[in-house]
């Protein structure tokens, strides 16, 4: 098992399937911030360059898959240019993962909201636990924010 800065652990099986478990330290839920997305981008790069990896299963070590954007980080964005840069970086890593040519499956074990849902939408398939309390959604629209990772394109394509 490989640990990517404690936020994502990787386990490559004998079958060539890489299991990536998001488990952001110090947070009750995984949130989309630099501490998660830097190792996420490194994981996507490894998926792209390591021929022994045949596919990826992405899941969470927490009770929920991912709660979306880190509101503390979002509140520190001071300019439109900064907001644009953050959104473009997220879109770029998700688009890279989506177009690699290797299958990526999100194993959604709890709520996937906002950026967490966008991560799962960039996967080729999603498997969701059967729990009537589980929520998938983009609640940022209620705050006047647009989904920044490409979810406005991917979600309608799936529905």
Predicted regions and their residues:
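Conserved CoA-thioester-binding segment of acyl-CoA-metabolizing enzymes
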Residues: 1-59, 77, 92-96
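Glycine-rich beta-to-alpha active-site loop
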Residues: 61, 96-143, 147
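Terminal peptide-recognition signature
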Residues: 20, 39-40, 58, 70, ...
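Hydrophobic, secondary-structure "cap" segments at the distal end of domains
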Residues: 152-159
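Glycine- (often His-adjacent) and acidic-residue-rich active-site loop
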Residues: 60-93, 112, 142-144
């Amino acid at each position: 098992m490989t640990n990517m800065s404690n936020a994502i652990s990787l386990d490559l099986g004998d079958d060539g399937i890489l299991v990536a478990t998001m488990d952001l330290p110090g947070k009750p839920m995984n949130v989309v911030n630099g501490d998660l997305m830097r190792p996420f981008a490194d994981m996507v790069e490894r998926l792209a360059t390591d021929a022994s990896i045949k596919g990826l299963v992405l899941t969470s070590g927490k009770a929920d898959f991912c709660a979306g954007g880190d509101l503390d980080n979002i509140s520190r964005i001071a300019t439109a240019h900064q907001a644009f840069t953050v959104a473009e970086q997220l879109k770029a890593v998700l688009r890279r993962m989506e177009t690699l040519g290797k299958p990526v499956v999100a194993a959604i074990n709890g709520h996937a909201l906002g950026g967490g849902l966008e991560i799962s939408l960039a996967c080729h398939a999603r498997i969701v636990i059967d729990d009537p309390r589980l929520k998938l959604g983009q609640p940022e629209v209620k705050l006047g924010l647009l989904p920044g990772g490409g979810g406005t394109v991917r979600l309608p394509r799936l529905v």
